[in-house]
UniProtKB/Swiss-Prot annotation:
Residues 188-404 are annotated as: Domain III, AAA+ region. One of its GO terms (molecular function) is ATP binding. CDD domains: AAA (cd00009), Bac_DnaA_C (cd06571). PANTHER family: CHROMOSOMAL REPLICATION INITIATOR PROTEIN DNAA (PTHR30050:SF2). Residues 1-73 are annotated as: Domain I, interacts with DnaA modulators. This is Chromosomal replication initiator protein DnaA. The lineage of its organism: Bacteria, Pseudomonadati, Pseudomonadota, Gammaproteobacteria, Cellvibrionales. One of its GO terms (biological process) is regulation of DNA replication. Pfam families: Bac_DnaA, Bac_DnaA_C, DnaA_N. Keywords: ATP-binding, Cytoplasm, DNA replication, DNA-binding, Lipid-binding, Nucleotide-binding.
Length: 524
């Protein structure tokens, strides 16, 4: 029946314009329409109980309002329920049985135990290559290698236990867990990434809540957990925190963390050495599989095929999957639709760039960890200038602390200015009033000259106010200087514009999204 679906599409369109992108993508976008018995009824399916409860609590009344006033075919009855799921336990009897069945059915290769190695063979160093077909195996160049221990079939199966390492200094722990067949699972979790030292703010509180729930109830409703957001925002920290918590909760748990490119490299080598069954048995026998930067699967059809079956096997066995990505799953070009669909079966949460207060809290926490007193004014100064992500924030703090250490001075705003002068000078060149005006004009599809003009139509006045707000927020120019740059306006006009936009950011989702997008463009 098309009428309820048409009304829902109209409702979704309205909600998308009303809500911030993070809220819309997390709560509204995953909802699906189920066939209704009557034209005035609508049955929506939520992917899990968490989404169901949140939508009912926060958005149900607005959904009812929009659907009841839909054009031509109002909906008077709206029901939301949870999609039926298969296995939902971390270690259910069904999950264990399914895993044992897969292991028994997979033909065994000769597997020899060896000392852990970061490589597969003694071949020359080359990047990992996607394997399009078995007929091309001979052409594949392999990962760099150290001399491995002798293997019966030339295949170092322990290399599966050497995933992408985000901790090259060796601080991460590598936990081995023997499994049937001689393989060893190594978690490669960074022990410093735990929930206790994750700084929470508005930008990441949903991600933290979801990760905490997964750690307490792995393999449950939030499976898979898909965390997306820009670089350096804490996605990997949360992923490691869940893994570390699972290992504490269940000592000996087979928790494997790796980068998506490592999964590809393992599969390529397995294909070349005719050991694909070892590969399948290894990745499908874990308790939790944590894969970073899933967007690198894009365009790799053979890897996507194998991961698709691995994904299904793990969910069937009640084993937890956590994935991170730099964008919403539906926006990953080159990724099969069936994978995108499955990524939405659990819970999808976004991590946004931290707001000012969270950036200050992060700086204070990091400084405290290394025993460096950081005054509030210095912390706020750094946080106001470094906006894009936590990694850049930490990098700036390290420069400040090093400068204080080598000069024997206490940290102050003056010292921060000196330590970061190159970075601040670069920012001043990049974030100028002229640049702000150009970016805002392009964003709103108007001319820069319109921002200077006396025109007061809404299509020009609002972008002008946004540009003034950004100029005050991102530059050191005074209000009179900003007013002069916008057609010789009075400083009170600039002050009014800044106050107006600040209020609208709190109340208007469109303006809030516009300012967020413009800030991202101007500061990254």
């Amino acid at each position: 029946m098309e009428l309820p679906e048409s009304a829902w599409e109209q409702c979704v369109s309205s909600l998308q314009s009303e809500l911030p992108a993070q809220q819309f993508n997390t709560w509204i976008r995953p909802l699906r329409v189920q066939q209704a018995e009557a034209s005035n009824q609508l049955h929506l399916i939520a992917p899990n109980r968490f989404v169901l409860d949140w939508v009912n609590d926060k958005f149900k009344s607005r959904i009812d309002e929009l659907l009841s006033s839909a054009d031509h075919h109002p909906i008077t009855s709206v029901e939301i329920s949870v999609a039926p799921r298969r296995s939902t336990s971390f270690e259910t009897n069904q999950g264990v049985a399914a895993r044992q069945k897969r292991q028994q059915e997979a033909p065994r290769q000769n597997i020899a135990s060896s000392q852990p190695s970061n490589s597969y063979s003694r071949q020359p160093q080359q990047p990992a290559v996607e394997m399009p077909a078995e007929s091309q195996m001979a052409q594949v160049e392999l990962l760099p290698a150290a001399p491995p221990a002798p293997l019966n079939n030339g295949y170092n199966t322990e290399s599966f236990a050497q995933p992408y390492n985000d901790n090259p200094m060796g601080q991460g722990k590598v936990d081995k867990v023997d499994v049937e067949g001689g393989l060893q699972h190594k978690s490669n979790l960074n022990p410093t990434f735990i929930f206790d030292n994750f700084v929470v703010g508005k930008s990441n509180q949903l991600g933290l809540a979801a990760a905490t729930q997964v750690a307490e109830n792995p393999g449950g409703s939030y499976n898979p957990l898909f965390i997306y957001g820009g670089v350096g925002l804490g996605k990997t920290h949360l992923m490691h925190a869940v893994g570390n918590a699972l290992c504490v909760r269940k000592p000996g748990a087979k928790v494997v963390y790796l980068h998506s490119e490592r999964f590809v490299a393992d599969m390529v080598k397995a294909l070349q050495l005719n050991a694909i069954n070892d590969f399948k048995r290894y990745y499908r026998s874990v308790d939790a599989l944590l894969i970073d930067d899933i967007q690198f699967f894009a365009g790799k059809e053979r890897s996507q095929e194998e991961f698709f079956h691995t994904f299904n096997a793990l969910l069937e066995g009640g084993q937890q999957i956590i994935l991170t990505c730099d964008r919403y799953p539906k926006e990953i070009n080159g990724l099969e639709e069936r994978l995108k669909s499955r990524f939405g079966w659990g819970l999808t949460v976004a991590i946004e760039p931290p707001e000012l207060e969270t950036r200050v809290a992060i700086l204070k926490r990091k400084a405290e960890q290394v025993g460096a007193p950081l005054p509030n004014d210095a912390a706020f100064f750094i946080a106001q200038r470094i906006r894009s992500n936590v990694r850049e924030l930490e990098g700036a703090l390290k420069r400040v602390i090093a400068n204080a250490h080598f000069t024997g001075r206490d940290i102050s705003v003056e010292l921060v200015r000196e330590a970061l002068k190159d970075l601040l000078a670069l920012q001043d060149r990049l974030v100028s009033i002229d640049n702000i005006q150009r970016v805002v004009a392009e964003y709103y599809k108007i001319k820069v000259s319109d921002l200077h003009s006396k025109r007061r139509s809404r299509s020009v006045a609002r972008p002008r106010q946004v540009a003034m707000y950004l100029a005050k927020d991102l530059t050191h120019h005074s209000l009179p200087e900003i007013g002069e740059a916008f057609g010789g306006r009075d400083h009170t006009t600039v002050l009014h514009a800044c106050r107006k936009i600040k209020e609208m950011i709190e109340s208007d989702a469109d303006i809030r999204e516009d300012v967020k997008n413009l800030l991202r463009t101007l500061t990254t």
